[in-house]
Amino acid sequence: MHRLTLPAPAKLNLWLHIIGRRPDGYHELETVFQFLDHGDELTFALREDGAIRLHTEIEAVPHDSNLIVRAARRLQEQSGTGLGADIWLTKVLPMGGGIGGGSSDAATTLLALAHLWQLDWDEDRLAALGLTLGADVPVFVRGHAAFAQGVGEQLTPVDPAEPWYVVLVPQVSVSTVEIFSHPQLTRDSLPLKMRPVPEGNSRNDCQPVVEQSYPEVRNALNSLGKFTEARLTGTGSCVFGAFPSKAEADKVLALLSATQTGFVAKGSNVSMLHRKLQSLVKKSSA
């Protein structure tokens, strides 16, 4: 195989509690990640000369510091391969939205190139490499909804309900550094002691600070909150609400379309990236 096209799915933080701050400045978190059947798309083509070339219309991030390029080069260095790749990115997910666009792109890159370069790397090794690129990368490498602890890298698989979601995308990029350094951020939520993880009595501890700093996000939460419980995902700008059917979610998004931008997507406990990879493995072994 010399060419491969794979999705890079979005994720939601169904809730996010900050339970402390470490001596190195990073925050201790508890959160639940769930995937959406919606995301970017990447195409990879094998190069024999070892070069990594990213082709995209997005110019906000310099080529060499783009997380896709960094992931490819890190895997190249660690594996010792002499192969390279051309990578085409079709960008759908917003930057700074809190739905994992950059981390998901990096994870798809690691999994795709491990397949394309025929590396004998298992998921554990790829997830460990992913962690060096960002705390959210391992959950995309693993591909299963998870209860996350630590800085988000300690993952326990979970299977929450898989509703349809309306996700609103305010036209603003939220700075994670700004939010986590905000003096009014809650940093002392009590760690959960119940298993399985309770869905009730949860929240996003970053939401009050983001609402205060970004009126566009506050307006989106208020708009969606007229129809269902609306919540911020991660430390980004996107807000979401759950609905029992696609028809109901589509109706709500249509009602909000005059003032809000967004999309409807199905929640999924197994990412569409992993479903696609599993189908490729089945085809190759058939």
Curated annotation (Swiss-Prot):
One annotated GO biological process: isopentenyl diphosphate biosynthetic process, methylerythritol 4-phosphate pathway
Catalytic activity: 4-CDP-2-C-methyl-D-erythritol + ATP = 4-CDP-2-C-methyl-D-erythritol 2-phosphate + ADP + H(+)
Positions contributing to ATP binding: P94, M95, G96, G97, G98, I99, G100, G101, G102, S103, S104
Gene (UniProt): ispE
Protein's job: Catalyzes the phosphorylation of the position 2 hydroxy group of 4-diphosphocytidyl-2C-methyl-D-erythritol.
EC number(s) on file: 2.7.1.148
UniProt keyword annotation of Nucleotide-binding present: yes
Keyword field: ATP-binding, Isoprene biosynthesis, Kinase, Nucleotide-binding, Transferase
Pathway: Isoprenoid biosynthesis; isopentenyl diphosphate biosynthesis via DXP pathway; isopentenyl diphosphate from 1-deoxy-D-xylulose 5-phosphate: step 3/6
Enzyme class: transferase
Residues annotated as the enzyme's active site: K11, D136
InterPro entries according to UniProt: GHMP_kinase_C_dom, GHMP_kinase_C_sf, GHMP_kinase_N_dom, IspE, Ribosomal_Su5_D2-typ_SF, Ribsml_uS5_D2-typ_fold_subgr
UniProt keyword annotation of Metal-binding present: no
One Pfam family recorded for the sequence: GHMP_kinases_C
Protein name: 4-diphosphocytidyl-2-C-methyl-D-erythritol kinase
Entry's Gene Ontology molecular function annotations: 4-(cytidine 5'-diphospho)-2-C-methyl-D-erythritol kinase activity; ATP binding
Entry's family note: Belongs to the GHMP kinase family. IspE subfamily.
Matches recorded under NCBIfam families: ispE
